[in-house]
């Protein structure tokens, strides 16, 4: 790394001399920089402790930001020049990102392809309306405003914006204005330090529009949301995984556990990857695989929320499960099914219970009064664990909470066969709750 820096700084030194247009022997790079459009670049080189390495054969290509470009960077990052110059590690990383090995003149710049820098990151140059435009690793762009400034050991191209290498997930969000509300939220929840750590993390990052929609949905102002630190922390942590998971590695249809308690799932649809959150709301991944130094970002169009209801509460909120809820209450199973679990419940509809009463030739009152039978029947509808549709075992006996011998079988077409040879169709799947998942069935299944 230092050998590359030594050779690069020699190029910068010559660049400043070339900018003076003098035929005299070159003067010190810092003296030249004082009256040159690359003054702040010269200060940055000095502040980074790199001036002693101004030698080396090269050749190199340097993309040199103007003073105006540095001023714009300070405004973008919300820091002063003194703060920037005090951070030698950041300066070294940024400065070496502006250098490419080899002499690449304007006519030879490879367009539309990744160009590796001395820093190790990549940038891309494209032709746009007759100009050459650089796109950095944060998706920011800079225009090449002057080209082919010849130096003894390379060439310099002036640019109108400081380009930045890939940063942490927080830095990547800070560099993109569409995440300004997300950044405010991370600051308010004191999560910036966590997400600036080594990670790795996967962040499902909601846009400003996604946050605006959430405020409308919850009936809150932004100030009220940012002031509610417990809620904000829970919501933000629900968007973060403790590992790097690229879009091609996302486990489709399976429970995904974030930093926050709970889970969500991701499904592949014709329009792309879609998240179903704990409240059964959906968010689309609109941009995937924005790589950061400590993880990866997937941009989403809706803020996802952890579940606020358990299995019993979710069933109680749906009028089509009113008989099921009555049965659970009569069997005194509510406390069990409200525990952390997780549980998978095959939930019969009201119509399924009515059909059972006819089949058994009994009344609801008589069935619900037989607590022992009711408990056996209801626990036969419960399987331990979060078994989403994609993971339902087919063609094999599945143990239930009714007992190790009280098993059921599910076919590939999602038809359950109970121990009496009766069948029930799974008519709706993957209703997520705080402590498990519900699959809706059209018939009450029965154990032996």
Functional labels for PLM-detected ranges:
Residues 10-18:
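Bacterial N-terminal signal peptides
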Residues 20-448:
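Mature, structured domains of secreted/extracytosolic soluble proteins
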Residues 1-9:
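Bacterial N-terminal signal peptides that target proteins for export
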